[in-house]
């Protein structure tokens, strides 16, 4: 209507709506965090994280906040039957949650690899620490190590590929012998 009257449209409503969407996304992610930390409601957390990431993809892409990683932990835990709200999940829903966990971990792994390519000296230590944590995190016990044998073959292969790629990135980030100072001989 304003344009029809020859007046320029204000961009303020669009900016306010975008700011509200970002705030809603942040709030949704924070609620997901609360579901995990205080309520052990992992399935609910996954839904909150999914909606928050869809509304503001930057929330998922921030490696330092570990939000996408924590969302993957929630999905893996719910898929394993852990948490207050996991009892109602059927096999199909558990498989979907495992796939969601895999997708989120794969996205983070790709982002860490890109960071290593762009800033190897700066990222190396964080990557080594993070990849070691992933390998040891009990949240993924049902999709790692010997537990992989319990998964359907196609799913098992995808998870094994993730763990293999994770180890490859960890090794790539590890200090190379030619970069390490040579020990001095003592007389």
Q: What residue ranges belong to the model's regions?
A:
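Alpha-helical protein-protein interaction modules
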Residues: 1-187
């Amino acid at each position: 209507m304003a344009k029809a009257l020859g007046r320029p449209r204000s961009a303020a409503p669009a900016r306010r709506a975008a700011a509200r969407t970002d705030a809603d996304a942040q709030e949704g992610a924070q609620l997901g965090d609360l579901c995990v930390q205080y309520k052990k409601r992992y399935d609910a957390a996954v839904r909150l994280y999914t909606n928050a990431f869809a509304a503001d993809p930057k929330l998922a892409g921030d490696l330092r906040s570990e939000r996408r990683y924590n969302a993957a932990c929630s999905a893996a835990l719910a898929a394993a039957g852990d948490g207050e709200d996991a009892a109602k999940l059927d096999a199909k829903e558990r498989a979907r949650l495992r796939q969601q966990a895999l997708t989120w971990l794969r996205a983070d792994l790709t982002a860490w690899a890109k960071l290593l390519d762009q800033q190897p000296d700066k990222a190396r230590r964080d990557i080594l620490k993070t990849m070691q944590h992933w390998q040891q995190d009990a949240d993924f016990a049902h999709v790692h190590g010997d537990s992989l044998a319990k998964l359907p073959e196609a799913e098992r292969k995808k998870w094994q590929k993730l763990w293999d790629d994770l180890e490859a990135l960890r090794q790539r980030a590890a200090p190379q012998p030619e970069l390490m100072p040579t020990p001095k001989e003592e007389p």
